[in-house]
Amino acid sequence: IQQDFDAKWYSDPQLRTNETFVLDAVENGCSPFKAEIAWYLREKSVPKPEYKAEIQKLKNISKKNLAGVITTNYDTFFEKLFDDYTPYIGQDQLVFSSIQGIAEIYKIHGSVTVPDSLVINEQDYETFNEKGKYLAAKLMTIFMEYPIIYIGYSLNDSDIQNILKDILLCLPNDKIERLQERLCNV
């Protein structure tokens, strides 16, 4: 899909949004497909009013009990909700940064703020999976120190399963039990 979209985007100017954000991203080497998706999600992602109370509860919990957020979502919901948290975008930023494990957001599939970071096509997922062991090693240090709460997606998600599998392969049985006690799925 991305290759077809990119070819059409270059050949048909009417397909382009002509937003500076998109044009700058493409000029810097980003795929038009990723740039347009990032722009669209930036513009259209708005919290639903019917979730206002739940969002406020999550914000209140974070002030006392939430060390960090790990998400596969591209949008900026968590950055806006927890504006004092530091976001780490993509595996490279997470793996090669000196993280503290407190007040941080780990956007493992990228972010709309960095369109080229989006894990969205087959090649992106292959690269993501190839580097999965490095990500798992970094996350393991966080998981062993802090409780883990999964919000919004199932533990049946293949990306989550792969990360957990990679972590479990590195741990002795007593540490696996400790990790299991720290997992909570909402």
Language-model-detected regions and their locations in the chain:
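Conserved catalytic-core helix/loop/strand module for nucleotide-ribose chemistry
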Residues: 1-122, 131-146, 155-186
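Short helix/strand-bridging catalytic loops that position acidic/His residues to coordinate divalent metals
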Residues: 128
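Active-site loops and adjacent core secondary-structure elements that bind or stabilize anionic groups
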Residues: 152
